[in-house]
Curated annotation (Swiss-Prot):
Family the entry assigns: Belongs to the thymidine kinase family.
Keyword Protein transport annotated: no
Gene3D superfamilies: 3.30.60.20, P-loop containing nucleotide triphosphate hydrolases
High-level lineage: Bacteria, Pseudomonadati, Pseudomonadota, Gammaproteobacteria, Vibrionales
Entry binding sites for Zn(2+): C145, C147, C182, H185
GO CC terms: cytosol
Binding site for ATP: S9, A10, M11, N12, A13, G14, K15, S16, D87, E88, C89, Q90
Annotated catalytic residues: E88 (proton acceptor)
Subunit note: Homotetramer.
Name this polypeptide is given: Thymidine kinase
Amino acid sequence: MAQMYFYYSAMNAGKSTTLLQSAFNYQERGMNPLIFTAAIDDRFGVGKVSSRIGLEAEAHLFHADTDLLHVIATLHEAEPRHCILMDECQFLSKEQVYQLTEVVDKLDIPVLCYGLRTDFLGELFEGSKYLLSWADKLIELKTICHCGRKANMVIRTDEHGNAISEGDQVAIGGNDKYVSVCRQHYKEALGR
């Protein structure tokens, strides 16, 4: 029986690398994975999942209004799929997370979701909130703070490297804008 998995972490913990390894494992066994990523995240090019260590794969895009159940069912009917791999899942809507539960429950296809748990203010993203609520399995991927402790928070920085404590929830960026830190250093950076 298929299940939905949510692999979550702060930035730079290897979520995309883990997704790409999963895709390779399925392909190595002659199976056909289907990869999606958020259209909003074009840091490494449109329609690609890329990792910091240089791995990449082509991916279908999801937008805020994409009906994932319909798209996946249509692609699965044309060519059977053995798993769905979703990158940047923090950008999913509540409805899209529900659609992914339908892929698992009605199409019996495993769905592996990868994304950030919280934003730079320590607040849950909508997609992450519902994945934490509805996924069958939750797997935390770990990275480390500069002090050596587990990093579970993300700081957004300005062009001078100073921590920012206000702004839009979504601002696409990588190491140029975000730093993963432990809770203690998060609070210190924001003066809390």
